[in-house]
């Protein structure tokens, strides 16, 4: 407010002067030239005095303000003295700390200078992560703070000694540098130690990569397993494709399906045996057996491929023994392993086969039992009997294999659990087939109802197979089984 008032006064004092000058100036310029010169001089002198007076007035105000400040100088001096007494310590401390930090910063910040002195140390420090630099800086700052505190105490006690101490850290700077270099050596060792986990980290990365490779290996193993799955299928096909033993194994399967398996196909199997055993089964030699087996393999393969086309059941059931090739092979090998037992049991089967042969004339003549069995099929569907008879004419193995996988799917477990009991069970069935025939015919009828149209298509697909199969099968039924 004072400034505003002063400015207003200045304006009021200044504004009338030019008006006066303007008013009087034409007079001076005009007629009153000579007189007015003196007046002009007087007025100029007055204006100059006013200006000087105003200037002096302003200076006096300024001086008054300075005087008020000067009057308080004593108290301010006391405050300034106390502040100066308090302030020089942090200022001196700051100067000392800055002097101490300057060489240390020169030492810590440029690692290139360290490389000049310690090239062997600097080379790992180049690889040192930034965190370790920060840790080193923190440690150096800790030492600097301790050193600065020591210097502060010395400054407070002896200002002259502080200068010596200030000069001494410059003198001691190589020692500090050596200490810091030792710390840096230790830090480099630490960094090397940290580099070692970094070096170990490639090992971990290798382990991770190995693990990543292992899933690839696992994938390869899975792929191998997937490759093994076709190998399993191939192995499942191999015992069907291999010439003598595997075909005999399939003959064992056929024989077991005819003789050992306690299923409703067994009486039909016996019907097949009774139909085919009188068809000169004894005229075949072992060589004919081997030739017929090898010749019968290819139609078997076709037949194995074709029951997949028959129905979903047969496809699933034919797939099951392929998914269980080793199990079936083990089950096939099991009767080989207790060969003496099987030989001991096979005479029984021969005896029963004799009984079968005793029954076969009735079966050729369609004895009442078997004829009752077959009309049971005819009662269900006359086409079924025709189809089954055509299948018996074309390939009995087709008939064995089409429901055979059902037998395998259900009976392999029975063979796993009780491989030996499979042999006496058919004796019970041969002794009393009529007791189990109704269930047998019901299940056979179910199988036959599931397959009628597709079974019709099968004999059309296999026109040229029947002779070979008729040659191959009867040997595979009884005699190959007896030979084992």
Swiss-Prot record:
Positions of post-translational Phosphoserine modification: 123, 159, 181, 188, 201, 349, 353, 363, 367
Modified residues (Phosphothreonine): 246, 360
Main localization category: nucleus
Span list, region Necessary for nuclear localization: 7-87
A Gene Ontology term for the protein's cellular component: nucleoplasm
Biased composition (Basic and acidic residues): 1-25, 306-320, 413-428, 438-447, 454-463
Keyword annotations: Developmental protein, Differentiation, Nucleus, Phosphoprotein
Name the record gives this protein: Hemogen
Organism of origin: Homo sapiens (Human)
Gene giving rise to this polypeptide: HEMGN
